[in-house]
Amino acid sequence: MTEMGHRALIAYERPDSLYNCHYSHWGACNLRLKRDITPERPFGGDRDNEAARCLFDALAEATTDETVNRVLKETAAPQSQVDQHPLVIGTTIETIITEHLDYLHHEAFYVVDAEFEITAYRTHWFGLQYDSRTIEHAPTVGNGALRTVRWYDGEPVGDGFAQGEFRALKAVVGEMVDQGVFSPAEAVEYMCKKLDAWAGTRDEILVRTPVER
């Protein structure tokens, strides 16, 4: 049985402007990877490691799974916060957030650009099956919103409040669906509008729903 964690996906920009997507089992906790990923520690960790950097550079150039497997076999990098074996290589952000990111089980998503500037997003799942008696199932992949978090002095500001705010919103919306005020589609539309209003001009909101695909 897989140990519960604080799961995250990380998209690393490649020299060809595409992305490699990696998984971290604990990377969403306190959005720690925004601090822990650096050019010297591309997969996180407590200390700089040249082998990890060489592995990262080689993976950034890989174009086939065979190359990935060979590079991983040949490079003895230490264990790290981010799984070194990529889930997918040479893809786009759009593909990751619509086809790979699980908005229920992945608590965070990071985009690491070529200069190692990192954008951290919290995930908000639109599924209401745990908040409504009349909804039995909702997809978890490609069905939610990504929301940036404000930072001050290296720490996320208002992260816990924002998560609680969205949980409370879902509880209210789920009840409104049960009362016939909203259809499931109208419920998602309402949640999107509330997120946009809360974000204002400070935060970035990215929304993906199955209807869009």
Give, region by region, the residue ranges found by the protein language model:
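Acidic, polar-rich N-terminal leader regions of halophilic archaeal proteins
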Residues: 1-213
